[in-house]
Amino acid sequence: MKIFHNLSELPDFKNTVITIGSFDGVHTGHQSILKRVKALAEAVKLPSVVITFHPHPRLVLEGNNAPVQLLTLTDEKTYLLEKQGMDYVVVAPFTKAFSEQSPDDYIEQFLVKYFKPKYIVIGYDHHFGAKRVGNIDYLKNNQTKFGFEVIEIEKQFIDDIAVSSTQVRKALEKGDVATAAKLSGHYYSFSGTVVKGQQIGRGIGFPTANIAVTDPHKLVPPHGIYAVFVWHKGTRHKGMMYRGDRP
């Protein structure tokens, strides 16, 4: 998989199978879209392209102090997208000017200009353009003009819960990591830097690693004790995590 963070570095795409979205958390709803993209791209022998954005649109539109809690930071998101077998991931810069494009300019000057899609696989609730007035019907109305086909992926349900990033966040904010994992299709994860503590645990026979999560917008589960897997230098270890001020 190839990852691009700058539109000027993109290859000269001719025909592609694309999908577009924030993909925060890369949950089972997102995965249903990505599976369709991958299967279709393989069937028609065209490259699969996932287009996502950085920073998160709300941080641009509402400011960096917006109460945004992300399930995945950009590197975490691209890692999960890679596991879905995509050929290309494009992390497009999201700016105020980009958000103010008309839906027509978004289609012609962004999607068609850079990706020349043959197929656009998209979720039922996708919106785009200034004030989010563009939607899936708007894309469908432009199929003939630009020669692409729009494929809509319907809302996904698990245990009568409509899968969404919002529902995953709600579960995590309550400490319900089991429901979050079921909706996500994977365990919730975060990464950070090990920082030196008072080494009290080591003194009583339970050495610990203090992890600093420095991005203020990364969602961290509430205070509590959690069973975890820890990846360190390519090896997975079982562990216990305490989240709180002092164990």
Task: Give a label for each model feature.
Residues V68-K77, Q101-I107:
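Glycine-rich, highly charged phosphate/nucleotide-binding loops
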Residues K2-S8, V90:
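Short acidic-hydrophobic, aromatic-tinged amphipathic segments that line or gate anion-handling sites
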